[in-house]
From Swiss-Prot:
This is Phosphonates import ATP-binding protein PhnC 1. It comes from Rhodopseudomonas palustris (strain BisB18). The gene is phnC1. Its EC number is 7.3.2.2. It catalyses: phosphonate(out) + ATP + H2O = phosphonate(in) + ADP + phosphate + H(+). It holds the Pfam family ABC_tran. PANTHER family: AMINO ACID IMPORT ATP-BINDING PROTEIN, PHOSPHONATES IMPORT ATP-BINDING PROTEIN PHNC.
């Protein structure tokens, strides 16, 4: 479904953010991307849809190689890719409904976009999505009146209304409290399964990654150092990803209780 081959990114200052990353993601497969700060996780996600231009390598979505597309063709192909951001990227003065419908702008003509006129089927799908993410009672509320967890749910609904084939998710829980983080991750993974969506989730919390993401890819200094099941994150593997002292702090978690936590604790104890 998605194939990344020998992808590199070197910035003008000579810093190599990605060093020959190769990765395949199947239809409906959800993977977690973990690693220390500066490992290249966000760069990798942004290179997939060319928000950042890679220096070399290939990114292929289905039968289409994204790295070779013109700007016009790239805009069309980006409709197949939903993006969920850490900072939410909502339009503060617009309502929840209007922010969700913004995900359909790529399918709407200029004047309809200008006057925010959307097809009835888009409106009905937005309502259904807001019902699913638990925000139907906030449909007319402005985005700047929402909590962090609610804002992230709007971002999820906006990405899904595109009806994408792939989701790129960049630190969806970084600004959220532990309980809300688990709720958002559960919702995100459930929606991917329900819609058979492939997803790459850049996540800083190893405990959350283990609890909700069956396959983990570990990056260190722009290199893939681990690609395997969450259950394979042993102390040795985590050290190769984070370093001798850093992984225990990253994996410490929030200490809360929720579905799946006994499994998380067992994994962490086994790793130690």
């Amino acid at each position: 479904m998605l194939r990344i081959q020998a992808l590199t990114k070197t910035y003008k200052n000579g810093e190599a953010a990605l060093r020959g990353v190769s990765l395949s993601v199947g239809a409906g497969e959800i993977i977690g991307l973990i690693g220390p700060s500066g490992a290249g996780k966000s760069t990798l996600i942004r290179c997939v849809n060319r928000l950042i231009e890679p220096s070399s390598g290939r990114v292929q979505l289905g039968e289409v190689e994204l790295t070779g597309l013109s700007s016009g063709a790239l805009r069309r192909e980006r409709r197949r890719i939903g993006m969920i951001f850490q900072e939410y990227a909502l339009i503060e003065r617009l309502t929840v409904m209007e922010n969700v419908l913004a995900g359909r702008l790529g399918y709407t003509g200029f004047w309809n976009s200008w006057f925010r006129r959307f097809a009835e089927q888009d409106i009905q799908r937005a309502i259904a999505l807001l019902e699913r993410v638990g925000l139907i009672d906030h449909i007319d509320k402005r985005a700047d009146a929402l909590s962090g967890g609610q804002r992230q749910r709007v971002g999820i609904a906006r990405a899904l209304i595109q009806q994408p084939e792939l989701l790129l998710v960049d630190e969806p829980t970084a600004s959220l409290d532990p309980k809300t983080s688990r709720s958002v991750m559960r919702l995100l993974t459930e929606l991917c399964i329900e819609n058979r969506l492939a997803a790459i989730v850049n996540i800083h919390d190893v405990v959350l990654a283990q609890a909700f993401l069956p396959r983990i890819v570990g990056l260190n200094a722009g290199i893939v150092v681990y690609d395997g099941p969450a259950s394979g994150l042993t102390a040795e593997v985590l050290t190769s990803i984070y370093g001798e002292e850093d992984w225990t702090r990253t994996a410490a978690g929030d200490g809360g209780t929720d579905d799946g936590e006994p499994l998380i604790i067992a994994r962490m104890e086994a790793a130690q």
